[in-house]
Each structure stands twice: as structure tokens, then as C-alpha cells.
């Protein structure tokens, strides 16, 4: 993995030229922000705090976008984004610190490793073997790319690497799980036979370790949104840009302004749900055609009392990777709860075809098999559907074969002076993360002329 040699602040400053005489200095400026996710709320918060007339249009009946904190039984669970991936030089952590919000070190305890093929719980040696496979494969990525070329998928690289290592049987199965699930289908949320080998594991990584927002991301989102002019249940369907204004059609209304900032996910832009007049440039539409959205889903299961011991790693005997991880979040959620994660091939297979009851039953069957016991009926359950959500189109962006970070950079470019874009997919070094969404909102607020950010916690950004 490449690590940045520049502080995140310097990187952001290089990407966001400041213009103290720009639109933010004009009292007639009115910015319409499309989307009340972290990117949109960050931009709106910074603009509003700088005195810029700003309105946010949100399609859903809630704010937060792909952050969504809800309760399952007596437990509070993040059903979308759930971690701060690194807290050093992270604007999300800086904002939390400035707002008096807290976060805790992720202390997930993996106590159960179950291999369905051998019908056995595995011990420390198996964990070590998977760690070694992960480190070995990622360490050999450059050589694999040279050997296999630009059209190779991670699955191609995995097969070559396992063959080169002479692995077979259980050793090959453990290595496959580490590469397919840890590296790809839970990290990038996409099928291992679609993610391009060329750019996998090339993003910059913030230091400081993974942390979990205390009480969930909901408190962070509420702090961003406080006092903002937000219209819920306003899905945007059309954006028209003229020489001196913008018109945005939403929920049968026409909202006018001087600038519009579009922060919807790649999945929404690709769907054509929003029409643009004039049409988006060929550069942007071609970039969108190469990018895609991953599919990471969660099934949250709560009980009145915990019956398990720690978190579970489940190695499916099938290639689809059904329910590979269950996190015990009881300590941070305020009640006994397991959250199962699944992505990539399995998520695509079941989303839109299985009912919620079937998804829950499948998760309980995995737990029963792994723990070799009857599982009590949960007191409450909740199943996510990011894959089929029309306002998301998936979980977050990934790079299939043929896509590159240049496509993410193309998404970040304005179309003229009045149509701007933000979102996790517009930050090529950190895409797929909440901090990327916040970075992009800050970038566009600066582009609109906010020189000095006064929002508590973000003054240095």
C-alpha cells in the first residue's frame, strides 16, 4: 500500500485553490447542494458558516446518506459506514474533536474461526496462515501486475499467486479466503473476479488505527446538519445550468440558485436518475461508465442476552463467500448484538431475490454451524439493502478492470463555473471512505471561495 508523504492538509490545499474574490464573497450567491450525506453536509456546513446562502436537497426522509445509525433491539448500530479508518490527518476526527464528539479504538476480538469445508473451528495456526497469505499476496502485487497485465482481475492474481506458492487443500482455501474476503469483497465490496488487479490496495492510508464513533455516525451527521436549510423527501430529477443561474427540479418544485453542488453516489449518476442540461461532458460520462459501485451489506441481530463469545470469521465452502464475518459490537452498541457483513458475489446474488427473513435465516444457519449449537431466536433484526437502494446504487465506489484513479479525478472536475461535484468517489487517494466524502465537501467549499473555514474542528482544513 502506498503511504502519503504529504500531510492530508497539504494534499487538500494543493487540490483546492482558494479564491477570496470568488462566489462566496458575493452576497447574491446561492448554492444548492444535492444530497445530505457527509460530502453534501460538510460543504453546506462550511458554506453556511461562512455566510453563504445554502440549501440542501435530500431524496430520503433522513439525512446521512450512506451513513445510517439505527437501533436494533436495545443496541445502536451503524448500518452504513461504521469506522474512522485512521484518525491522524483525518477531517472527520478533527471535526469530532472540535464538536465534542468521541470515538473509540476498534478492539474487535476475533475468537472463532470456522471452516465450513472441514466442519471445524480452526486455531491460531490458521489465523497466522491467513495473515501470511494476505501479507504475501499484497507484497507481491507489483510482480503479479507486471506478469498478468492491465486486464487482470484480482482473481487472476490470486490464482497465479496460490499456484506460485504451491498451496493446496486447506492452505489454498485459507489463502483464498484472506485474499477474496479480507482484501477484496469486504474491503472493496465487489466481486474478486471484477476488481482490477492494477489499482487494488493502492489508496493512501491514514495512520492512527481504526476507530468507531461512540454512539454511531448519527451524532456526527446531526452536528454537521445543525441549523442548515435541508429539504427532505426531495429527490432531484433534473439540473439545468444557464449562463447566470442554475435550476434544480426536485419533488415537483424548481429550486433556483447561482451554483449547484452534486454529491450523489456514482450509482445514482450512472443510473440516469438525474438529467443534466447541458449534458455532462464526454470526459465525465466516460469516467462514470468505467467505474462501479461495490455491494457491502449488513444483517444486524440482537438478543436480550449474549449467547456467544467474541466475533466470528466464517470460511464458506462455497466460492460466493456467504456471511464471512460477524462482529460482536455489544460493548459499543449498548446491547447484545452481532452484525454480519457480506459483500461482492454473495451480496449481488441475494439482494433483490431473498427476503429479509431469508437473509436472517441464512445468517442464523451460519452461526449455528460455526458454534455447533441451536441459536435462540433474535429479539430484533435489521437487514440493509444498499445494493438495491435507488438513492445509493451500492455501498461505495470501486475500480473494475479498465478503470483508474484518473476516472475519480475526472468526477471531481466542475462542469463550467456553476456545476460542481463532491462525494467519496471524487477523491482518488481515499475513495470509499467517510473522510474522502468530508475532504471533497471541504474542497468544493474552498472552490466556491471560502478562504478561512470557521466551522469548529475544521478550521485547519
Task: Identify the residue ranges that each predicted region occupies.
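FAD-dinucleotide binding site
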Residues: 16-17, 22-461
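C-terminal motif of bacterial Sec signal peptides marking the signal peptidase cleavage site
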Residues: 11-13
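Intrinsically disordered, low-complexity regions
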Residues: 8-9, 458
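Sec-dependent signal peptide recognition
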Residues: 1-8
Amino acid at each position: 500500500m502506498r503511504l502519503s508523504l504529504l500531510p492530508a492538509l497539504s494534499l487538500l490545499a494543493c487540490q483546492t485553490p482558494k479564491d477570496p474574490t470568488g462566489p462566496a464573497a458575493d452576497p447574491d450567491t446561492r448554492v444548492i447542494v444535492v444530497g445530505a450525506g457527509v460530502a453534501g453536509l460538510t460543504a453546506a456546513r462550511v458554506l453556511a458558516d461562512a455566510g453563504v446562502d445554502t440549501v440542501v436537497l435530500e431524496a430520503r426522509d433522513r439525512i446521512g446518506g450512506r451513513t445510517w445509525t439505527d437501533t436494533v433491539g436495545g443496541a445502536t448500530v451503524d448500518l452504513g459506514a461504521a469506522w474512522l479508518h485512521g484518525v491522524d490527518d483525518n477531517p472527520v476526527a478533527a471535526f469530532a474533536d472540535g464538536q465534542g464528539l468521541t470515538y473509540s479504538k476498534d478492539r474487535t476480538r476475533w475468537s472463532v474461526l470456522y471452516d465450513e469445508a472441514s466442519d471445524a473451528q480452526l486455531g491460531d495456526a490458521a489465523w497466522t496462515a491467513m495473515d501470511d497469505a494476505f501479507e504475501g499476496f499484497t507484497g507481491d502485487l507489483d510482480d503479479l501486475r507486471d506478469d498478468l497485465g492491465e486486464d487482470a482481475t484480482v482473481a487472476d492474481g490470486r490464482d497465479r499467486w496460490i499456484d506460485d506458492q504451491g498451496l493446496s487443500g486447506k492452505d489454498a482455501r485459507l489463502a483464498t479466503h484472506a485474499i477474496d474476503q479480507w482484501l477484496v469483497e469486504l474491503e472493496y465490496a465487489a466481486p474478486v473476479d471484477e476488481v482490477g488487479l492494477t489499482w487494488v490496495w493502492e489508496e493512501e492510508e491514514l495512520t492512527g488505527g481504526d476507530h468507531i464513533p461512540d454512539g454511531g455516525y448519527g451524532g456526527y451527521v446531526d452536528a454537521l446538519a445543525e441549523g442548515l436549510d435541508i429539504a427532505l423527501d426531495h429527490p432531484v430529477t433534473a439540473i439545468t445550468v444557464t449562463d447566470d443561474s442554475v435550476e434544480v427540479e426536485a419533488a415537483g418544485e424548481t429550486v433556483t440558485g447561482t451554483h449547484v453542488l452534486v454529491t450523489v453516489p456514482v450509482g445514482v449518476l450512472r443510473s440516469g436518475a438525474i438529467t443534466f442540461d447541458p449534458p455532462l461532458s464526454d470526459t465525465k460520462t466516460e469516467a462514470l461508465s468505467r467505474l462501479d459501485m461495490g455491494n457491502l451489506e449488513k444483517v444486524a441481530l440482537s438478543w436480550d442476552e449474549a449467547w456467544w463469545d467474541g466475533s466470528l470469521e466464517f470460511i464458506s465452502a462455497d466460492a460466493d463467500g456467504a456471511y464471512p464475518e460477524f462482529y460482536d459490537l455489544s460493548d459499543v452498541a449498548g446491547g447484545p448484538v452481532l452484525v454480519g457483513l457480506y459483500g461482492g458475489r454473495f451480496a449481488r446474488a441475494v439482494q433483490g431475490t431473498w427476503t429479509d427473513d431469508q437473509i436472517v435465516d441464512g445468517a442464523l444457519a451460519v452461526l449455528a454451524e460455526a458454534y455447533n449449537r441451536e441459536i435462540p431466536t433474535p429479539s430484533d433484526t435489521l437487514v440493509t439493502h444498499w445494493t438495491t437502494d435507488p438513492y445509493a446504487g451500492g455501498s461505495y465506489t470501486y475500480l473494475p478492470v479498465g478503470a483508474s484513479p484518473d476516472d475519480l479525478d475526472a468526477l471531481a472536475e466542475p462542469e463550467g463555473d456553476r456545476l460542481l461535484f463532491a462525494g467519496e468517489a471524487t477523491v482518488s487517494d481515499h475513495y470509499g471512505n467517510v473522510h474522502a466524502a468530508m475532504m471533497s465537501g471541504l474542497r468544493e467549499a474552498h472552490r466556491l471561495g471560502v478562504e478561512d473555514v470557521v466551522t469548529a474542528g475544521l478550521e485547519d482544513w
